[in-house]
Amino acid sequence: MTRAISLYDVSKAYAKGVRVVDRLSLDIAPGEFLVLLGPSGCGKSTVLRMIAGLEEITDGQLLLDGEYGNDLPPSGRDMAMVFQNFALYPNMTSRDNIGFPLRIESPGADPAGRVDATARMLGIEDLLDRFPSQLSGGERQRVAMGRAISRHPSAFLMDEPLSNLDAKLRNHLRAEISKLTRELGVTTVYVTHDQSEAMSLGDRVAVLRGGVLQQVDTPRAVYALPRNVFVAAFIGTPRINLLRGLVRAPLDGAMTISLGKQFLRLPEPLSLDHQLLRVQQGREVIVGLRSEAVRIDPKFSASSRRTGAPAPAARPGEVAITGLVEHMEFQGHEVLVHFNTGSRPAVVPDLEAPRPTRRPIRRRRREGTVLNRLRDRAGALRAGPVVVLEHPAGPAPEPVAAPEPRLPGDLVVRTTPDIDLRHGMQVPLLVDIARLFVFDQRGERICPAPDRLPDLEE
């Protein structure tokens, strides 16, 4: 039997009232595969532990199949958890590790049949008599998954189970997990910071930032219609191009978005989404362009290709800009070209894990002799620099965002490897305005308009 899991305004606070999860509401349908996605420290593992009963819920309600579950002990929730570090007993063989929860559940029963059936399902029959120290990382994770599956739980909770494995093994096990959970039809909540895992595994993806739910939707919808600039920047490889823009909407002229040295002219007649941008006249916005929304002008491409094929015509709704080649990343089947268009990149904070900030020590005059003050100063010098994690009572200082490393160019474009490009070359580009995202200064999406979503073909 699989189960429904519902969270209503769930919060988790630790010492001094610091909230790591803030009023989270989620409904997970029976048999659904939901992925909790976000940067390190966003609270996704804490949510998983609250569902499992390993963390107390500070506020809000957890419902399991519609029944109040806040006070249920972990053993009464009928869930199985798969951990990042495998958590196998080193003095037990794989057979004993898989059968351990069955022996605890029914001490008098023989678990051999269920252990063998689980091993066949995972293809690990030849590993049953080995100890964890004799297994590779991928084999250990398969055994850990077998231990969870053998119980026939009503829900799987997986906390970054693939993060300790190499890339090739991650891809292989990702496919195995997807196939296995669909065959079993068990409700699965999967935590990861890897968007590739989230997009390939989940029926739905819930994006968290600082303990707050940003968006929950299908992988396709989260990519195609990010609710805010954080989701847009966190989802997608390469990362979406985010540029600062200024809306200009004169009554007697064409509507444009200035990017600094160049501008995007919105094609007429204006679409409904673009008409709604008129209210942003004279305001700064954030323009989002994914790498597939910009392409090299076909005329330039044709003259640069070794094939000499005729140039296709530009598509309706494309507008022209130019870019200077600053860097190229050869990927084999494609090339990611970094262009300098004279635009100002927009920075989205908290895309990675927050780190303690080094701050200068504020010295105050203290009472005492000159000798005492010199002794204190000598002690401070011996101790070295101090990392301040908490601030004394008083007005909170303004948050200081750590400067991001400067990347070459301000616009990344996908292209094919047969186009001859060189550093410093001026290249004509075409921007597909239909794929344009516009966010306001708070980071909320205003184009496409949030209350009128385009039709997404399944």
Predicted regions and their residues:
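The feature captures the beta-strand-to-loop junction immediately N-terminal to the Walker
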Residues: L37-P39
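ABC ATPase nucleotide-binding domains
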Residues: P74-I235
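Conserved post-Walker A/P-loop segment of ABC ATPase nucleotide-binding domains
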Residues: E55-L63
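Non-catalytic connector elements of ABC transporters
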Residues: L251-E458
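ATP-binding/catalytic-site motifs of ATP-hydrolyzing domains
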Residues: Q61, E67, V212
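ABC ATPase nucleotide-binding domain
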Residues: S6, A13, D27, L63, ...
